[in-house]
């Protein structure tokens, strides 16, 4: 086995090379990563290596041999598959690692994200929904010193940036959202999809699933005439009544 192949072969299902393939298949079946769209990157905390899904591979068929591996310090590729090129998302993934101290980043072409980007302006907003409690607030508990989640009564805000012809051209707007929304764990790209990050792949997956649930709910609320961020008890003021 070559030194490059050692990086991606493991019997551990939670090894980044195995986990990326497992999650890409799952996201394909969720209709989030079809037609080779989307991608995942995971930082291995044991080696400080970035594992990156390639460009142009069908996500449900991805294998560990398809993955790129990069040294987090030198940003040099330690492993490059012959059949594929690096994901166009790579500069965006690196920005999340370097500026947000992410441990993993998920990029999907979720239809819910795309529709929300057409309905909302500069930011997606939803409030007073239980699932919001799965999203980090960006604050730290003064007693336990642990990260705090948003509460039921909080408003989740996710910035929306404009799409570009090429994904690497999104980098300037991504850096701006880091500055304008320092507590966010996601950014929606209009007519494109969403990027979600977290301190670990488990957290990033939870955040991504919760946000997609909330976006789907917001779309249904919008169809009923209910603003997704309306106050508790105000729903019926906006509700579109069915014709008798």
Swiss-Prot record:
Keywords: Amino-acid biosynthesis, Cytoplasm, Lyase, Metal-binding, Methionine biosynthesis, Zinc. Zn(2+) binds at residues 107, 109, 192. Binds 1 zinc ion per subunit. Its cofactor is Zn(2+). Pathway: Amino-acid biosynthesis; L-methionine biosynthesis via salvage pathway; L-methionine from S-methyl-5-thio-alpha-D-ribose 1-phosphate: step 2/6. The active site is at 130 (proton donor/acceptor). InterPro entries: Aldolase_II/adducin_N, Aldolase_II/adducin_N_sf, MethylthioRu-1-P_deHdtase_MtnB, Salvage_MtnB_euk. Its EC number is 4.2.1.109. One of its GO terms (molecular function) is methylthioribulose 1-phosphate dehydratase activity. It comes from the Eukaryota. Substrate binds at residue 89. It catalyses: 5-(methylsulfanyl)-D-ribulose 1-phosphate = 5-methylsulfanyl-2,3-dioxopentyl phosphate + H2O. One of its GO terms (cellular component) is cytoplasm. It is an enzyme of class 4 (lyase). PANTHER family: METHYLTHIORIBULOSE-1-PHOSPHATE DEHYDRATASE. Catalyzes the dehydration of methylthioribulose-1-phosphate (MTRu-1-P) into 2,3-diketo-5-methylthiopentyl-1-phosphate (DK-MTP-1-P). This is Methylthioribulose-1-phosphate dehydratase.
């Amino acid at each position: 086995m070559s030194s490059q192949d050692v990086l991606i072969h493991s019997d551990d299902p939670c090894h980044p090379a195995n986990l990326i393939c497992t999650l890409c298949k799952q996201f394909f079946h969720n209709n989030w990563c079809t037609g080779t769209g989307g991608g995942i990157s995971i930082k291995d905390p044991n080696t400080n290596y970035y594992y990156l899904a390639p460009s142009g591979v069908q996500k449900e068929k991805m294998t560990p041999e398809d993955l790129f591996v990069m040294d987090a310090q030198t940003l040099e590729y330690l492993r490059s598959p012959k059949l594929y090129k690096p994901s166009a998302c790579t500069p965006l993934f690196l920005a999340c690692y370097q500026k947000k101290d992410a441990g993993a980043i998920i990029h999907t072409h979720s239809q819910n994200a795309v529709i929300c980007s057409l309905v909302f302006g500069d930011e997606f907003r939803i409030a007073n929904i239980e699932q919001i409690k799965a999203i980090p607030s960006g604050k730290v508990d003064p007693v336990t010193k642990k990260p705090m989640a948003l509460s039921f009564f909080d408003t989740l805000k996710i910035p929306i940036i404009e799409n570009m012809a090429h994904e690497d051209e999104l980098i300037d707007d991504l850096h701006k959202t880091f500055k304008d929304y320092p507590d966010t764990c996601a950014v929606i790209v209009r007519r494109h999809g969403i990027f979600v990050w977290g301190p670990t792949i488990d957290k990033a997956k939870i955040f991504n699933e919760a946000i997609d649930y909330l976006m789907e709910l917001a779309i249904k609320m919008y169809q009923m005439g209910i603003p997704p961020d309306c106050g508790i008890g105000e729903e019926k003021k906006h509700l579109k009544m069915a014709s008798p």
